[in-house]
From Swiss-Prot:
The chain crosses the membrane at residues 15-35, 53-73, 109-126, 136-156. This is UPF0114 protein KPN78578_33570. The keyword Hydrolase does not apply. Belongs to the UPF0114 family. It comes from Klebsiella pneumoniae subsp. pneumoniae (strain ATCC 700721 / MGH 78578). It is found in: Cell membrane. It comes from the Bacteria. Keywords: Cell membrane, Membrane, Transmembrane, Transmembrane helix. One of its GO terms (cellular component) is plasma membrane. The keyword Membrane applies.
């Protein structure tokens, strides 16, 4: 009975495979939105204001960071929790594949969230005159919470590595 339960639990990790595949569908949707934003701005490229152009570019950078985060979570999560990716060595293989454990993935996700939050906060500050002060305050508090959380996770990771 024990062996059956252990095998069933071990096999259940494959339930995560469609979840990681679903993230790739999210990446497709994000790519469509990315190019939709580009095609939206192109006809107005010569008439758009500098601040609107910067806001558009920040949106594109934001989407790019989210896309990178999705790729990182998809591949690292799949390799850490489901099965090793069977990709031939060579130019196409990402250098970090197989080298990122759950802890380093968590730290990279936290750093990515801070970067995404920073860009969002910059976009808010560029339009600060139209944003109520209390809303600005909450954006800053939420961003600082992300920064502090990422710092604490990195610090705790460093502490556990030193002790072992």
């Amino acid at each position: 009975m024990e062996r059956f339960l252990e095998n069933a639990m071990y096999a259940s990790r494959w339930l995560l495979a469609p979840v990681y595949f679903g993230l790739s569908l999210g990446l497709i949707a994000l790519t469509i939105k990315f190019f939709q934003e580009i095609f939206h701005i192109l006809p107005h490229i010569f008439s758009v204001s500098e601040s609107d152009m910067i806001l558009t570019l920040l949106s594109l950078v934001d989407m790019t960071l989210v896309g990178g985060l999705l790729v990182m979570v998809m591949f690292s999560g799949y390799e850490n929790f489901v099965s090793q990716l069977d990709i031939n060595e060579g130019k196409e293989k990402l250098s970090w594949l197989g080298k990122m454990d759950a802890t380093s993935l968590k730290n990279k996700v936290a750093a990515s969230i801070v970067a995404i939050s920073s860009i969002h906060l910059l976009r808010v500050f560029m339009d600060a005159k139209n944003v109520p002060d209390n809303k600005l305050m909450w954006y800053v508090i939420i961003h600082l919470t992300f920064v502090l959380s990422a710092f604490v996770m990195g610090y705790l990771d460093r502490l556990t590595k030193v002790k072992h």
